[in-house]
Each structure stands twice: as C-alpha cells, then as structure tokens.
Amino acid sequence: MSKLLLKNVDYLVTFNDKDEILRNYDILVEGNKITKIGKDIQTDETGDTEIIDATGKVVLPGFVNTHHHLYQTMFRGIDEVQEMPLFPWLEGLYEFWKYLNEETVYYGSMVGFSELLKTGCTTTMDHHYVFPNTSKSTLIDEQFRASEEIGIRFHATRGSMSRGKEQGGLPPDSVVQSEEEILLDSERLIDKFHDSEDYAMKRVALAPCSPFSVTKSLMKSSAELARKKGVMLHTHLAETMDEEEFCISVYGMRPVELMEDTGWIGPDVWFAHGIYFNDDELKRLKGSGIAHCPSSNMK
C-alpha cells in the first residue's frame, strides 16, 4: 500500500465540528485514507513512505465539485452562442454536441479533471447527458478511464434525454434515447462502477437531464431504479423562467410540483441551479440538496 507523510504542516485547516486550525502537525496517508494526524510522526512507524516537507504550507481538505459538464470543456468560445439565454444556447450547441464520441468525452474529461485538480478540487461529479445516435453508449466508461488515470475521486451521473423535438422537447432527436436504452445502460454502469464503500473513488448516480428534455415516465423509472440500487438522483431544476413556462404548459405544474409528483424529493436527491423557487417550494425542498452555480447563473 502506498504511503504519504506530510511533515511540519504550518496550518492544518480541519473543517471539523470545531473549525480547528492546527499548527505544526504531521499527516499520514495510507492508500486513499488519512490514517493519522499528530505531532512528529516518525518514519520508522510507516515503513517505505514518501515524505513531503510541508513547512510554511497550508493543508486543507480538497474541494468537492457538485455540478459539472466535462464534455463542454471542448466547446468553449463558440461565437454563435455567446450571451444567449439557456434555451437558444442549448439549441445552438446541440448542433455541435450531436457529434460527440468516446475520444471527445475522454479528452474533455481529462482537461476538466486537470483544471479541477489544479485549483484544489479532489472530488467531482459530472452530469453527462448527451448520447448521440452515432456514438456508442460507453461514453461514461471513458470518463471513468480518465478519472482513474489522473487520480481524481469521481462520481459520474448517468444523464439522459428521452424527449426530443418530435415529442415537444428541446433537444434534437439525434441526441435522445429510448427509456429502455437509458435504464439498461444506467443499471449496467451502476453494476460495473458504483462502489458504496467509504472512501470510494468511483460512484454512480442517475440524472435525467431536465424537465424539458425527458418524459415524466423516465423521471419515475429512474427514481425507482436508483432506490432499488441504492444510488443518488440528480437533475437540473428551476434554472430559467423558460423551464417554468415549459412545465406549466406541458405538465400543468411548476418544476418543484413535478419533482414531488415523480418521487424526486428527499435526502437522496440533489438539484442543480435552483434559482426560481418561491418560499413555499423552499420549505417543500427541505432535506433535498441544491448545487448552486453562480458563475453560470450570473452570466
């Protein structure tokens, strides 16, 4: 088992219940676990160990990224979609995303993981929901390959889109899948990659993309499968007024009511964005998680 010993950490920021900041401490890491924190940990206790002198350094827990789209790192700076509201922005970019393949997803993940690690983020999720008809269904497998190679803790969410333009949704039909195909691949990924143990480096959650790109049936089926398998649920919610208008027009209810109706409220659910909730909805969401994305929503 690999071991790492950080010696003489000037400031160890614990983020524990007391928010303690410890001075001049050592940290011993064995494998993927911090096994000891203390003063003057001796090398003869640890055997063959890599030692780093942390004098003058600050050490703190790695940041955790709770919402991301790694493949989008490959599509930055496209002039046609700059400064657009969400719906036309998506419609413009779908014309590029419909050509996604395994290579693009792998390298997009490597770029994104590198940027995250460089800025102190050691755990990240990703919400990948674009599966073009021309690509294989193993795009998320490529993300796990990249995460293992670079060494980041990765929680993949198996995103999905089942409501294309022909069914009144936003995405083109070339990037949507059938409900059966989505659920079969979701179960395959859970069985192949999900590790429920403490300190796991790989986990899987289920993440239908949004109320305007999936069917009500898929939301319910995904929730049932996730709870059967013991994994979490994630989706975009209340990100724009266009989404609210879509939900009222198609379902006759606001986004939060739709989530309640499909079994998507609870401690095993976290939503992305969530900026158009009223006071009553905030009370009903108590216990569910929200990933706030200010750099996106303040554009």
Question: Where do the model's predicted regions map?
Answer:
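N-terminal metal-binding scaffold of metallo-dependent hydrolase/deaminase domains
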Residues: 1-46, 58
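Active-site-adjacent C-terminal substructures of enzyme catalytic domains
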Residues: 264-299
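Alpha-helical scaffold segments that flank or form the walls of functional sites
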Residues: 78-127, 131-153, 184-198
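Divalent metal-coordination and catalytic microenvironments
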Residues: 9, 27, 32, 56, ...
